[in-house]
């Protein structure tokens, strides 16, 4: 294979999957075949999309009812020649799913890149090992928390929140994705003030915390804003990838003047991936493509919390982020939304140690504040790694958290 293989889930009311697959392969490449003169067929043969797999799936009555018609479900795979597109994500996505995304019940499930094509993508700059080296934490999951309620608040409020989270043992504190450039907490002031707080906590408590600052603005201003953040001392850049595009992420990741990790937020991605019938699969969008484009971290809905993703999908995202690939470093999985300490055993059981446990209300909503919330999570992480049930741990902060949010992992064993 020298190009790319696209895998689709299709629902076809013509009930002829082979014909539908061939129509897609031709429609996204040379447009027609059977009516072309033989000489022209020979000339265009190297540009033709090739159907390499057609598999019929069991009928879904629920799907038929939803669509109000009877359809045949199937998985098809089509190989697109590298000659047809430039080696960049806009060209690849337009080739494999451009106008097809408008053509009925078709979902892009996966893209398989040839080795030659992979070489055109940067992958994570730091990856899991690089992030762990920055923190000098190698034996446990990382703990991340989120600034909450920052809109309309000043730098003093930010510093207080940041200090409490760092003292609580949090490894990374990130901006809320809806915190943009503003007069009260401008980008560089957040970074400079935040670094002062984190340095003070490190000197006093010996715990290192990194700050992920939200880089925002108009697309053509992003690089300059990112470089300003780096010059001010930013540890990590949080980026709302899908409000801008994967290629914008790649351009940031490839820039040598932006030598910091990038954390990809999934905001807007639901518009692409939420449907079971249309769009792009979550594992491809939030896993493989983010990793290829340069994300060191990928946030996505966990299978447990308030914005739950199906467990199979969440694990598939993580697989794409962390599977061995000689071309790319591994990215951190960050299952998120509604996470509290009682979920820690589930997260470690399902995602392993190389995961970032991300909490907002589960830290800030603790009766002992963010310090108590952070400590409750750290205790839950340590207990889980020792295979000790959380309800048996004698720790006031963890006990308080379990009383508030419950202990659904009561019987979980690693």
Curated annotation (Swiss-Prot):
Binds 1 Mg(2+) ion per subunit. Keywords: Amino-acid biosynthesis, Isomerase, Magnesium, Metal-binding, Methionine biosynthesis. InterPro entries: Diketo-Methiopentyl-P_enolase (IPR017717), RuBisCO (IPR033966), RuBisCO_lsu_C (IPR000685), RuBisCO_lsu_C_sf (IPR036376), RuBisCO_lsu_fd_N (IPR017443), RuBisCO_lsu_N_sf (IPR036422). Substrate binds at residues 148, 174-177, 265, 338, 360-361. Mg(2+) binds at residues 174, 176-177. The active site is at residue 99. Pathway: Amino-acid biosynthesis; L-methionine biosynthesis via salvage pathway; L-methionine from S-methyl-5-thio-alpha-D-ribose 1-phosphate: step 3/6. It comes from the Bacteria. Its EC number is 5.3.2.5. Its cofactor is Mg(2+). The modification N6-carboxylysine is found at residue 174. GO terms for biological process: carbon fixation; L-methionine salvage from methylthioadenosine. Has no RuBP-carboxylation activity. Homodimer. This is 2,3-diketo-5-methylthiopentyl-1-phosphate enolase. It comes from Bacillus cereus (strain ZK / E33L). The lineage of its organism: Bacteria, Bacillati, Bacillota, Bacilli, Bacillales.
């Amino acid at each position: 294979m020298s190009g790319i293989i696209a895998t689709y889930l299709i629902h076809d009311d013509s009930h002829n999957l082979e014909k539908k697959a061939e129509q897609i392969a031709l429609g996204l490449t040379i447009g027609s075949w059977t009516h072309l003169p033989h000489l022209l067929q020979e000339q265009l043969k190297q540009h033709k999309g090739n159907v390499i797999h057609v598999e019929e799936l069991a009928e879904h009555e629920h799907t038929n009812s939803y669509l109000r018609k009877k359809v045949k479900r199937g998985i098809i795979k089509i190989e697109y020649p590298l000659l047809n597109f430039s080696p960049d994500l806009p060209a690849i996505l337009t080739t494999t799913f451009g106008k097809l995304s408008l053509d009925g019940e078709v979902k892009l499930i996966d893209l398989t890149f040839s080795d030659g094509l992979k070489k055109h993508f940067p992958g994570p700059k730091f990856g899991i090992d690089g992030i762990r080296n920055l923190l000098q934490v190698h034996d446990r999951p990382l703990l991340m928390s989120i600034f909450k309620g920052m809109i309309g608040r000043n730098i003093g409020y930010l510093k207080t929140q940041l200090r409490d989270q760092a003292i609580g043992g949090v490894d990374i504190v990130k901006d809320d994705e809806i915190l943009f450039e503003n007069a009260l907490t401008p980008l560089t002031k957040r970074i400079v003030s935040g670094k002062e707080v984190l340095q003070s906590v490190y000197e006093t408590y010996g715990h290192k915390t990194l700050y992920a600052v939200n880089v925002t603005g108009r697309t053509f201003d992003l690089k300059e804003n990112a470089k300003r953040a780096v010059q001010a001392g930013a540890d990590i850049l949080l980026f709302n990838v899908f409000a801008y595009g994967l290629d914008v992420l790649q351009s940031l990741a490839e820039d040598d003047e932006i030598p910091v990790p990038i954390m990809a937020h999934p905001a807007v991605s639901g518009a692409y991936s939420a449907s079971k019938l249309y769009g792009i699969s979550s594992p491809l969008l939030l896993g493989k493509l983010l990793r290829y484009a340069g994300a060191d971290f990928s946030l996505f809905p966990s299978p447990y919390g308030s914005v739950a993703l199906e467990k199979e999908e969440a694990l598939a995202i993580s697989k794409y982020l962390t599977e061995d690939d000689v071309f790319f470093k591994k990215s951190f999985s960050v299952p998120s939304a509604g996470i509290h300490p009682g979920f820690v055993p589930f997260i470690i059981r399902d995602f392993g140690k190389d995961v970032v446990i991300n909490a907002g209300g589960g830290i800030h909503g603790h009766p002992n504040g963010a310090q108590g919330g952070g400590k409750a999570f750290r205790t839950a992480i340590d207990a889980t790694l020792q295979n000790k049930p959380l309800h048996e741990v004698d720790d006031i902060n963890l006990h308080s958290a379990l009383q508030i949010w419950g202990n659904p992992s009561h019987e979980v064993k690693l």
